[in-house]
Each structure stands twice: as C-alpha cells, then as structure tokens.
C-alpha cells in the first residue's frame, strides 16, 4: 500500500458511540465452494491466521493447492476471536493434520511471513472496551510470534467491511455503524503495526463501494463472508504491497 494511504488511514479520526451486540460470539464458519487459485507470487510464502473470513481463503480455493493449501492456520471451528486467550489457541497443523498449539506450530514451521486479520469477531466489544484492550490482545499475539518464530515477517491486514445486506438482527446497531467500528479497529491495528515496525496492509479499501459497504460482487449471501473474486483482490493488494516494499 502506498505510504500516503497508510498515513491517511492511521490519522483519520472516527468517533462512534459504544453499542453492545446481543451475541458477541465469533461469527460462524459457512461452507463455500472451491474456485480458481490466485497466481500472486509473494503471497505463496504467507501463512494466514484469523477469523472465518481468513479460513475461507482455503474454502474458496484461491491459494496454491486449492482446498489442500497448507497456508491457512485455524482451529477445527475454522475461526478465532482476538482476545487474551488467542495466543494459547490450538490449530489443525496442515502438514500433519494434528491439533497442536499455535506456539508449537510457529516453532515447527517458522513461517517466512504470517498475515493476521482480526476485528469483525467481537467488534462491538472492542469498541466498548476501547483501544487499549484491542491493542493489548493484538500485541500479546505479536509478542508470541516474535518469541516463537523471530525470523517471521509479520503482516497485519485490515479487517474487511460488511455489506449493506448483512442480517443485523443480532446487533443493536446498523450495518453502517458496524462498518464505522471496523474502520476504527483498522486504525488501531495500523498503530500496532507502526509501533512494532510491522507491515500494515489496507485491503479493506479495495473491497468498499462508494458508501463504505462491502461491494455486492465481493459479498457472499450472508453479507460478511467473501466471494472468490474478493479474495483475489485481497491477495493482489497484499502481493502488490510486498512487491513495492521490495523495490
């Protein structure tokens, strides 16, 4: 991402009132069909860790090896929530299929790059608790990665927007307000990246329509999971950013 956009993202001030979601459990995994893989080369070296929208990189088959990709780390549920326990989570280790701790996976794999994407799960709680809680949870995870795999290049990816059609019946806020919360969380995530000298990539802006919602063509039926085309756009944005940093 161009440096100017990074600066603009991190300096935008968003003021939103705190609301409470009726059910703040992680958004569930849904089955998505396989599609054509992306040919982005830099992303071939990345391990992806995050929520169900990250797991769907595998479900959509957009990474090399399609649904058999070993580039996505996730628990059996297919989703994680960024909280104080995330660093102690168990994942299904793709190389063996066994369930091991994230710490063990980092030590075994020593990934060249690890891309983190968090924010939608628990978004309203993060806003209600304030930036210190969100940053604490993210920093804890970053510290674990640095400790267990010090040579890994850590990428913090922005959380993705939701579509206007998303069912908001479990929330006490509108889709527009939830997107404003996501924007705020992305600013906080950017600040974590800056503090630690990490790469922050604003993929969210590549998915938004003129009103800030997830574009229709990038939205699955539920309004928050993504289409294969959306993932190709995301992977291209990541690839382009990494390529620009190499040049």
Q: Model-derived features: where do they sit?
A:
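A short helix->loop->beta-strand "cap" motif at the edges of active sites that frequently abuts
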Residues: 149-153
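Generic structural signal for well-ordered alpha-helices
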Residues: 138-143, 186
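Conserved SGNH/GDSL esterase-like catalytic core that processes O-acyl groups on lipids
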Residues: 40-136
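Second-shell loop/turn segments in exported
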Residues: 89-93, 104, 122-132, 142-145, ...
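Positively charged n-region of N-terminal signal peptides that target proteins for export
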Residues: 1-7
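N-terminal, intrinsically disordered, polar/charged segments of Gram-positive cell-envelope systems
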Residues: 20-47, 58-59
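C-terminal motif of bacterial Sec signal peptides marking the signal peptidase cleavage site
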Residues: 14-17
